[in-house]
Amino acid sequence: MDWGTELWDQYDILDKHTQSGLDLVDKYMKFVKERTDIEQNYAKQLRNLTKKYSPKRGSKEEQECRFSNHQAFLDILNEMNDYAGQRELIAENMMINICVELNKYLQELKQERKMHLSEAKKSQQSLEAMYKQLDNSKKRFEREWREAEKAAQYADKTDQDLNATKADVEKAKQQAHLRTHIAEDCKNDYAAQLQKYNKGQSQFYFTDMPQIFNKLQDMDERRIKKMAQGYILFADTERHVMPIIGKCLEGMTRAGTNVNARNDSMVLIEQHKSGFERPGDLDFEDYSQGINRASSDSSLGTPKGPLELLGKNKNKTFRLFNKKSKFTPEKPVDTEGFTHLPPEQRRKRLQQKIDDMSKELQKEMDQSEALGKMKDVYEKNPQMGDPASLAPQIGQTAQNMDRLRGELNKYESWLAEAGGRGDSIRYSTHSINNNGAHNPNSHDGSCTLFSPGALSDETDPSQAIYTEFDDEFEEEELATPIGQCTALYNFPGSSEGTISMQEGEVLAVVEEDKGDGWTRVRRNNGDEGYIPTSYATITLNK
């Protein structure tokens, strides 16, 4: 069953029905558009929320992230930010795959419907024109036939009139014959117009309009199928991101399970342990023996009052550092050597300072080596550059290295005084001579920074930091991993400096995120590169 056969006389109904279908497409587009606006606003609000509660760089809150419960909250914020990104992706895909496509299809349907209705209108106008011609021919035939009948009656009357002349009778008969002939022509024309109209009407109702109605039916069915696809796509768009949203939710759950209350307590101890011994018992001062009072006051080495540890009331609470404490320095606080800190914290700060300066020295040595190689290239190929132009940079790098070596030795001596570890720090780099250029006589780039206690009196500390090896040990040591990570999503690693990874792959973390959103990792085969921090779950070694 089709429209052309069953609804041949329902042109107005089909006109309204097809228009209603186009209105539905437009309505659905507006609905999806408003849905995308809601998703965009929702994602924006989620991002603002995570930004509001995320710790600012260098703030106290960021320092608190060393505790697992604080880090878990930060992980939840990161997962929420990724979740917001998925909501944005839903809105973007709905806009592109549904709204844009349906809008384009709607314009095509409007043009097609307009064309079909225009064809129907032309056929209708053509049939009406034929009917008008038929009606005119019919009226003319009717009028001429009446005139012919009148002429015939007049001729008969004239013929019977005794007073009429022969000429009058002949003239009346000729007029009647002429009218009859004209009436016959009109009759034939009317018959021809009637035949033509009947043929056109048959063509109109049995061929032209059914074809047009069937085309409208085909157009409407295609529209309905397209709408069905749009309805399915509306759900599929969100369903496609559900696995990633599930990963985000799993990450939030994982953040909660990774909280370790006992470990947080240990971190607090490690962070704030002073290293001081608890105060001992106070000696009894016998004031009843007046003669020995002065000698007792001078001989006793105990504090004259208790150490105030907790509160402000001197009679009830104690504070570790008060004005009379034997630990309070008489001179200004030495912040450079961290002598103002408790012993345990001082050792940690000194070790951290040594590690930071060691990394900085390594960078300067790498830069000096690169400048030396560049200078060699310029000397061999003058057209590539002037070797003398590198002298300022080489000199500056050498000064920086000398300064850092001196600072490093100073901090290592302080660490030794504080009872810290005195193990040396090794670097994998080629030895650098005093002017900063590459030394071709060096067998290996490894150099060892010794603490001052490890040097003899005759040894120059600035020269004793180098240790030579054989030529075959030229390869650089790999940085020690500081943790590991598990990939949450696939990452192609197509950009320079990045590395690809597959979901679930475990990689070693070499360098943590510096705030730019990238973490440096290494595979078991030695391949290194950067990955997006948000694409992996990262666990750093404690």
Swiss-Prot record:
SUPFAM superfamilies: BAR/IMD domain-like (SSF103657), SH3-domain (SSF50044). The record marks 166 as: Mediates end-to-end attachment of dimers. One of its GO terms (cellular component) is plasma membrane. Residues 340-417 form the REM-1 domain. InterPro entries: AH/BAR_dom_sf (IPR027267), F_BAR (IPR031160), FCH_dom (IPR001060), HR1_rho-bd (IPR011072), SH3-like_dom_sf (IPR036028), SH3_domain (IPR001452). Keywords: Cell membrane, Coiled coil, Cytoplasm, Cytoskeleton, Endocytosis, Lipid-binding, Lysosome, Membrane, SH3 domain. Belongs to the FNBP1 family. The F-BAR domain binds the phospholipid membrane with its concave surface. The end-to-end polymerization of dimers of these domains provides a curved surface that fits best membranes with around 600 A diameter, and may drive tubulation. Required to coordinate membrane tubulation with reorganization of the actin cytoskeleton during endocytosis. This is Cdc42-interacting protein 4 homolog. The lineage of its organism: Eukaryota, Metazoa, Chordata, Craniata, Vertebrata.
